[in-house]
Amino acid sequence: MKDVGSLTEAEAANELMRLAKQIAHHNKLYHAEDSPEISDADYDALVRRNTAIEEAFPHLIRADSPNRLVGAAVEASPLAKVTHAQRMMSLDNAFAAEDVEEFAARVRRFLNLDEGEPLAFTAEDKIDGLSCSLRYEKGVLVQAATRGDGTVGEDVTPNVRTIADIPQNLKGDIPDIFEIRGEVYMAKADFAALNARLLAEADDPDKARQFANPRNAAAGSLRQKDASVTASRPLRFLAHGWGEVSALPADTQYAVMKAIESWGVPVSPLLKRCDGVADLLDHYRMIEAERAELPYDIDGVVYKVDRLDWQARLGFVARAPRWAIAHKFPAERAQTTLEAIDIQVGRTGKLTPVGRLTPVTVGGVVVSNVTLHNRDEIARLGVRPGDRIIVQRAGDVIPQVVENLTRDEPREPYVFPDHCPVCGSEAVAEDGEVDVRCTGGLICNAQKFERLRHFVSRGALDIEGLGEKSIAEFLELGWLEKGPADIFRLKSHREELLAREGWKERSVDNLLAAIEAKRQPDAARLLFGLGIRHVGAVTARDLLKGIGDIARLPGKAAELRAWVEANPRIEGESEGKYAARRLEAIKAILDVRADGIGPAVAEALGDFFHEPHNRVLWDDLLSEVSPPPYVVETRDSEVSGKTVVFTGKLETMSRDEAKAQAEALGAKAAGSVSAKTDLVVAGPGAGSKLKQAASLGIRVIDEAEWAAIVAAAG
């Protein structure tokens, strides 16, 4: 990796683009999916590299810079969205005593304080949990929300009401409005007991749900659609701050936290008021020494300026307050032997290498497995079975390999598989991506359940009565072995189904009727239901607007693949010119003009239909269903040819219905606001998109005005 000072402007721009994409990917995994794949230390290193490049090239700072963003968007969450009255911020990090000293010096410079003037802070342990905001009105809990992207989170009010640590009513003299913010977490002992219980309750111990660590367990338990699941999990809460308030009970951070504690909400027992940096560092060392004995996982100590009037003067940078910083703990390390490398296949087909280790204790925890992330990471480390390695456990979460001590020893290099170990399908990596994915899709047992669940979901075929439990049952019985086409053959198992526990004649017949009603499905929904990478609901509609008949899709996919093979980049042709030439060919072959269809979609289609298993699956499916040709009837309207964005809660129609209306009026329904947007339709709770539209001078209307436009088009 080049030193930042030696980067050219073009290299800096390219690296910032790569880092923005990479950090956003890891933010989504950590905050939205509760399945991080790199350690805190590796994540922090990416952010530090991004910050260093931005400081050297400030004119190259991107709109999607990680330093401007908090958490991850909750677009895909099944939970209702909540717009925070006051943004939930992140924290900047310190990794050494010098960083803490510089933080204090920055505060002094900003406030114009003399060196001898007292500067007090609070210090408390940084719990590794899920951030949550509790809104109390007149002392009564009325809403709870996750952080999400800092602006919009998920509504988890029913779930939070089941957590014993969180009072439904505060006691004492409470301001009319007071949002308490803190961490939902799971204690180490409770985490171990939960995994043991899930194992004991499982019919098949090999298939028992097991959480990787307490943070994942806490996040997965809180973000449930069914609050009774949350109630069965041992969740706890510690407050560390506040959001919107109508009044404050004191004028210092420490005093307000003590007031919150007096109202009945737990705060950290390690919270302390510190006079100066030396006192902060003493408290940090004390907490670090006791870390292994604490009942919960922590990954550092948070320092905050104590005086609230000084906090107000210091204010915020893009994603974090100037008056607070998180002092992270160094990673803990140990030596061991890499015994084997296994490949796990995830629900999206991603092949993840997992290192099997001679068990070793790292930071008080026995580690026997470690993620190796991807084939590039294996190549970078040069690891092979038999190597002696150093394992690091950073942030009390994910163990990782940081060094191969025997890479120079002569031994055959590890060869990453080019076929799926589960189903034998080709495993490929798309251009510009490090992840290798199985192309088997629905014929791959590792992916089959999730793909079938997606196929029958509301956005796809929307088969009522065919939920997760039924799909799992039918898969176990072998009734869905060939993929989605077998759904339409379930009627042949009617008598067997009636004989099974939990199935009555009415429920069986209702399910079979719902399936039969989808024999002529909307072609775009059918295509979306296949779960082809990069082919979402909007892309599926855009594709079918061009090709019309879905039966033509495999042929078009073959044309796309053939064009790439027959048209390599010409010597002397710039990458940009080749990309433009390829994009033009893609749009000509598919007869589309939509912005969202380009090389990624073309490559995904080509890979999917090139796989023989998928062609068999496709032909089998079309033998059971007959989607009519896809025809988009458009009407003349004032939005014809324009780009429309819907944001906020729509009260008279679903988001899908609104997008369909826009397309019927000849408009394009986009998911994000940009300079190309012509109109924004905003419902209650509209947040960042509405602000962006205002800053760009884009026309904004409400749902009633949109209904008038639709009505006027006839």
Curated annotation (Swiss-Prot):
Keywords: DNA damage, DNA repair, DNA replication, Ligase, Magnesium, Manganese, Metal-binding, NAD, Zinc. Its EC number is 6.5.1.2. The active site is at residue 126. One of its GO terms (biological process) is DNA repair. The keyword Hydrolase does not apply. Coiled coil: none annotated. NAD(+) binds at residues 40-44, 90-91, 124, 147, 183, 304, 328. One of its GO terms (molecular function) is metal ion binding. PANTHER family: CHROMOSOME TRANSMISSION FIDELITY FACTOR 18, DNA LIGASE. Belongs to the NAD-dependent DNA ligase family. LigA subfamily. This is DNA ligase. The lineage of its organism: Bacteria, Pseudomonadati, Pseudomonadota, Alphaproteobacteria, Sphingomonadales.
